[in-house]
Amino acid sequence: MERLSEQTCEICRVGAPLATAEEIAGFRSQIPDWQILTIDGVQRLSRTYRFRNFAEALEFTNRVGALAETEGHHPAIVTAWGEVTVQWWTHKIKGLHRNDLIMAAKTDALLE
């Protein structure tokens, strides 16, 4: 199976297909620590990372931001003392796209 963390996001336009349940299930083993949440009817991937202090959390936040700029796909990020919560979804299609799965895997890879 193709590694998500080695893929590149594609340009996503309004009307692009949502990730199917089968596609999401097929890649769950590569992003096992991510939860699927539904907020205001929109599915998103969410994960909270733990750190020893605020400085480490902020440094990780900046790395996620740099990754988002490189890929042209941007998450919601909440940074607090000792933790960072990252949520990926695709605003244009109001749900999960393959790009979100890719970015979840790439976010995890920042800590490898």
From Swiss-Prot:
Which Pfam families does the entry mention? Pterin_4a
SUPFAM superfamilies attached to this UniProt entry:
PCD-like
What reaction gets catalysed by this protein? (4aS,6R)-4a-hydroxy-L-erythro-5,6,7,8-tetrahydrobiopterin = (6R)-L-erythro-6,7-dihydrobiopterin + H2O
Would you say which domain of life the source belongs to?
Bacteria
Q: Which InterPro entries match?
A: PCD_sf, Pterin-4-alpha-carb_dehyd, Pterin_deHydtase
MF (Gene Ontology)? 4-alpha-hydroxytetrahydrobiopterin dehydratase activity
* Presence of keyword Lyase: yes
Presence of the UniProt keyword ATP-binding in the record: no
Q: Which UniProt keywords apply?
A: Lyase
* Enzyme Commission numbers on file: 4.2.1.96
Q: Kindly state a single biological-process term from the GO annotations of this entry.
A: tetrahydrobiopterin biosynthetic process
Protein family: Belongs to the pterin-4-alpha-carbinolamine dehydratase family.
Task: Give the protein's recorded name.
Answer: Putative pterin-4-alpha-carbinolamine dehydratase
The species this protein belongs to is: Syntrophotalea carbinolica (strain DSM 2380 / NBRC 103641 / GraBd1)
